[in-house]
């Protein structure tokens, strides 16, 4: 199943530091929404915190039960990624919009609006600590939740 990415906007900062990288924007129908953040390779290290990321993806014309496919995160075991993903399902006119915060060390936010996150191969809810970042790995759901259960029940991002 293919997805097309219409826009992608990200900014970055060092963990525990000030903003040091300007906003990076990718606008291309060929861009893969699910493969990671478009940043120069020198910034794709464990010392960078990627935040304020927003992706707009278009699903096929059939309403799907998942908003996006499971894909691996950036390979660095200490990479912290915070992104807000908007999935639009047509013809269901369903919008799934929620920020996800996770550490790419085998943690996965679970389906739906669950605030539980667990490492893929363990029942523990504690993830590897990264600097001053909280050791609890969980998706952060926004105040505004526009969910339609039929389309979003298994919406998840696996890293």
Curated annotation (Swiss-Prot):
InterPro entries in alphabetical order: Keratin_matx, KRTAP_PMG
Annotated Sequence repeat ranges: 107-116, 117-126, 127-136, 137-146
Tissue specificity field: Wool.
Single GO MF annotation: structural molecule activity
Swiss-Prot/TrEMBL keywords: Keratin, Repeat
Pfam family, one: PMG
GO cellular component, one term: cytosol
Positions of the UniProt region annotated as 4 X 10 AA approximate repeats: 107-146
Domain of life: Eukaryota
Function comment: In the wool cortex, wool keratin intermediate filaments are embedded in an interfilamentous matrix, consisting of wool keratin-associated proteins (KRTAP), which are essential for the formation of a rigid and resistant wool shaft through their extensive disulfide bond cross-linking with abundant cysteine residues of wool keratins. The matrix proteins include the high-sulfur and high-glycine-tyrosine keratins.
PANTHER family found in the cross-reference section: KERATIN ASSOCIATED PROTEIN 3-3-RELATED, KERATIN-ASSOCIATED PROTEIN 11-1
Family: Belongs to the PMG family.
Record's protein name: Keratin-associated protein 11-1
Originating organism: Capra hircus
Name of the coding gene: KRTAP11-1
């Amino acid at each position: 199943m293919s997805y097309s990415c219409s826009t992608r906007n990200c900014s970055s900062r060092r963990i525990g530091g000030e903003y040091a990288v300007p906003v990076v924007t990718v606008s291309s129908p060929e861009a893969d929404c699910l493969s990671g953040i478009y940043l120069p390779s020198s910034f794709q290290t464990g010392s960078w915190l990627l935040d304020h990321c927003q992706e707009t993806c278009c699903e096929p014309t059939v309403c799907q039960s998942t908003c996006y496919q499971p894909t691996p995160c950036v390979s660095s075991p200490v990479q912290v990624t915070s992104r807000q993903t908007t999935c639009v399902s047509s013809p269901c006119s369903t919008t799934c919009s929620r920020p996800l915060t996770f550490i790419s060390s085998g943690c996965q936010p679970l389906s739906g609006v669950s605030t539980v996150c667990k490492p893929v191969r363990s029942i523990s809810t504690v993830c590897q600590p990264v600097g001053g970042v909280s050791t609890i790995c969980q998706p952060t759901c926004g105040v505004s939740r526009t969910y339609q259960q039929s389309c979003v029940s298994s919406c998840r991002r696996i890293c």
